Amino acid sequence: MNDKKNRYILHWIGQLSKIRPELGNFAICPYASKANYTIVDEKLSQIVPNNDFDVIIYVVEDNISAQFLYDAVDDYNRNYPDYKFIADHGKTKTYIKGIQTSNGKYNLVLCQLRNELTEARKKLAKTNYYDYWDKDYLEEVLEDDYKVVEIHIEPELE
């Protein structure tokens, strides 16, 4: 992977880790700065999960559509049920309270153990972390975990 891509992604991780007053003094991703992660340049079709790291950030081809990336990630999630794959398409911008959460440049697939992610989300649900999220975006991001955490957050989202 070229150094420019690596630096950009490291900067994005730094942005995800920043404490944000507009998010109740939470970071976009409160666990990002302490996670044991690696950044890997890989073809989308060649991704193979492993648990050597908390998170593996796969940088995949630039020339694929958002829908193709999301469909591939859905396939990975079905084929590797112990892992959670999350797509971040370079041209798709996502926000929480006006703060960009997506990297905005490269096509990425984040991979981590599903049970660890679910546990982290349960812990966050016991705080006011999710109070700042739009309900539709929250459901989109949490997917199956929405049902797991909604018991803690549903009253605030009404």
What would you call each of these model-derived segments?
Residues 1-158:
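Expand to "…catalyze enediolate/carbanion chemistry for C-C bond making/breaking, isomerization
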